């Protein structure tokens, strides 16, 4: 039986096959953050010299990419990318996701928005029927912490400050347990409209286009409907 680490590697390898299909001297690849994204980054090293470069969703990923000799570009200098590859904390059959366990949710949303296709890589344990078992990360401007926490409580959540953590943008994270997420796009908009929220970790208004889920029997590929 494959371990979770081996399943993550399997998912990363499947995404690298997609990179092989689009690689070229003018191609830029968007790269996410997290343990599965780290494996993708390590595999991306073999494309050194075959890509124009990469765009990273966090300082952590940028450092790892640079360590492999891959060019890391400023998103302001990039007009489009064929794919953005990232993991997920949870993903449902609609390819809506909860992300942000690593705290990079805002930059992940920004970088993903510039890519033509969002490729989610994960092991099969991340696939759920309904989002919400994993606490929802919400990036918050520090002065708004308590006001935002009250707003999240009114939505039925139980927000908790992620102690000792500051995002790459200088903000804090509230991890929200207990939310009922029947309408992920609607809840994403509602939370994002709370003054002081930078963004929440629901990726539903713009979810993944393709999910590559590693199973004991190989890769299960899901594509967004419509």
From Swiss-Prot:
Entry EC number(s): 5.3.1.6
UniProt KW Isomerase keyword: yes
Gene Ontology terms describing biological process: D-ribose metabolic process; pentose-phosphate shunt, non-oxidative branch
Gene that produces this protein: rpiA
Class of the enzyme per the UniProt entry, highest EC level: isomerase
Binding site for substrate: 33-36, 86-89, 99-102, 126
Statement: the UniProt record of this protein carries the keyword Isomerase: yes
Assembly behavior: Homodimer.
HAMAP family: Rib_5P_isom_A
Keywords for this protein: Isomerase
Organism: Bordetella parapertussis (strain 12822 / ATCC BAA-587 / NCTC 13253)
InterPro entries: NagB/RpiA_transferase-like (IPR037171), Ribose5P_isomerase_typA_subgr (IPR020672), Ribose5P_isomerase_type_A (IPR004788)
One Pfam short name: Rib_5-P_isom_A
The protein, known as: Ribose-5-phosphate isomerase A
